[in-house]
Amino acid sequence: MMLKPSIDTLLDKVPSKYSLVILEAKRAHELEAGAKPTQEFTSVKSTLRALEEIESGNVVIHPDPEAKREAVRRRAEEAKRLAEEEERKIKAQIAKEKEEGEKI
């Protein structure tokens, strides 16, 4: 029985068998948790779906882990900044409404 996608095809997409297993497992868990698929699948199982995505090149190992960490950190900082800005706007609106209420 021939497995599809073939291991040879998949190993062209990742540096090693070990990387392939880790990437497949992580993507399969993401799919099980409800992550949006990147394509239509022929397989039913999440592990085989993950392999199909890897074969098509839609799922890859991030080439620079440090750059990925930096991008995640920047996104977190931006989200925090936006939340603080929103909180300041709400406090200013509350103060304005309170001030207008005292004038009446």
UniProtKB/Swiss-Prot annotation:
It holds the Pfam family RNA_pol_Rpb6. PANTHER family: DNA-DIRECTED RNA POLYMERASE SUBUNIT OMEGA. Signal peptide: none annotated. Coiled coil: none annotated. The RNAP catalytic core consists of 2 alpha, 1 beta, 1 beta' and 1 omega subunit. When a sigma factor is associated with the core the holoenzyme is formed, which can initiate transcription. The gene is rpoZ. InterPro entries: DNA-dir_RNA_pol_omega, Pol_omega/Rpo6/RPB6, RPB6/omega-like_sf. This is DNA-directed RNA polymerase subunit omega. GO terms for biological process: DNA-templated transcription. Keywords: DNA-directed RNA polymerase, Nucleotidyltransferase, Transcription, Transferase. SMART domains: RNA_pol_Rpb6. Belongs to the RNA polymerase subunit omega family. It comes from the Bacteria. Promotes RNA polymerase assembly. Latches the N- and C-terminal regions of the beta' subunit thereby facilitating its interaction with the beta and alpha subunits. Its EC number is 2.7.7.6. GO terms for molecular function: DNA binding; DNA-directed RNA polymerase activity. One of its GO terms (cellular component) is DNA-directed RNA polymerase complex. It catalyses: RNA(n) + a ribonucleoside 5'-triphosphate = RNA(n+1) + diphosphate.
